[in-house]
Structures are given as C-alpha cells and as structure tokens.
Amino acid sequence: MKNRSAIKRHNQSEVRRMRNRSAKSEVRTTARKYTEAVHAANAENAAALLRELSSQLDSAARKGILTKNSAARKKSRMQLLYNASFAAK
C-alpha cells in the first residue's frame, strides 16, 4: 500500500473534524440558551449560562477550534447583551 500515510492523515483529520464540530455545536447551543434566557428576563439563569459560555469559548480558543480574537469578540458581545438587559435594572 503506497499511500498508507495519506490514509492515516485522512483518518486523523476526520477524528479532529468530528471533535471540533462537537465543541462548536456545544458553544452554539449554550449561546442560544443564553440569548433565550436574556430575552426571557431570567437574570440568574442568564448569569450562569454566561459563565458557562465564557468557559466554553476560552476552552475552544485554547484548543485552536476558535481563534482567540473570535472567542473574545463573542464573549464581549454576550456580556454587552447581559449588561444592556440587566445592569440598568
């Protein structure tokens, strides 16, 4: 088999793709739950989800799934949404 290393690299990339896809899906799901909690004016749940989302984004950035700036931008926007909804009240 001449292309054994190519087959191995392909298999490795598939494993990485599935792992990255799962992590990105987790982040998107938490972000959706967070925005729903903010729009429902549930401050306690939103605060807990914001902490969880921030942790997931940092983890994804550390693993190279998202870039550092992308994770920081998403965290900033979620914090702005939280502050606009609950800080004035």
Curated annotation (Swiss-Prot):
Keywords for the protein's UniProt record, in alphabetical order: Ribonucleoprotein, Ribosomal protein, RNA-binding, rRNA-binding
GO BP: any one term: translation
GO molecular function, one term: small ribosomal subunit rRNA binding
GO cellular component: small ribosomal subunit
InterPro entries for this protein: Ribosomal_bS20 (IPR002583), Ribosomal_bS20_sf (IPR036510)
Protein task: Binds directly to 16S ribosomal RNA.
Protein name stated in the entry: Small ribosomal subunit protein bS20
Source species: Treponema denticola (strain ATCC 35405 / DSM 14222 / CIP 103919 / JCM 8153 / KCTC 15104)
Lineage: Bacteria, Pseudomonadati, Spirochaetota, Spirochaetia, Spirochaetales
